[in-house]
């Protein structure tokens, strides 16, 4: 049994219908009737000595579970068991996207775009380096102010001139030097009250 080749995923979407003995156009009532009939025939309690009946019963249950779920049945009808595997891996809502992106024309489009943009270097330059290091960057709208670079030296000079203009009276007294013991040796007694409680 270990030497047995693993079953490949089909894309036709017909084998589950064959398990139940139906064709692809079967209604949900036909699926239920066929399932009940085959489940009674191959149930493990009715065939305790037959391990093949237990395997057949598992296949019947699997086919019934997939074909009675409308979403899974639709995926199976379109893409076969490969579609069910993709739905398991990526989610049922992403199956169509997966098959579109894995089609030959989507791969060809990706390769052509890669070749036209020098392995996507142009895209990287436009997104990361602001369109050729800023040479081709888009113009700002008429009403908005454009951003410009200010050197740190110019900014420092501007801040110092603003400080000089803002102070009306110069500071004449130097602050007293302080150490860790300043509060301990001070002549006045410290007050632990806040301003509101004096």
Curated annotation (Swiss-Prot):
The modification Phosphotyrosine is found at residue 17. Disruption phenotype: Defective SNAP-25 function, which causes neurodegeneration by impairing SNARE-complex assembly. This is DnaJ homolog subfamily C member 5. It comes from Mus musculus. One of its GO terms (biological process) is neuron apoptotic process. The modification Phosphoserine is found at residues 8, 10, 12, 15, 151. Pfam families: DnaJ. The gene is Dnajc5. InterPro entries: DnaJ_C_subfamily_member5 (IPR051434), DnaJ_domain (IPR001623), DnaJ_domain_CS (IPR018253), J_dom_sf (IPR036869). The keyword Cell membrane applies.
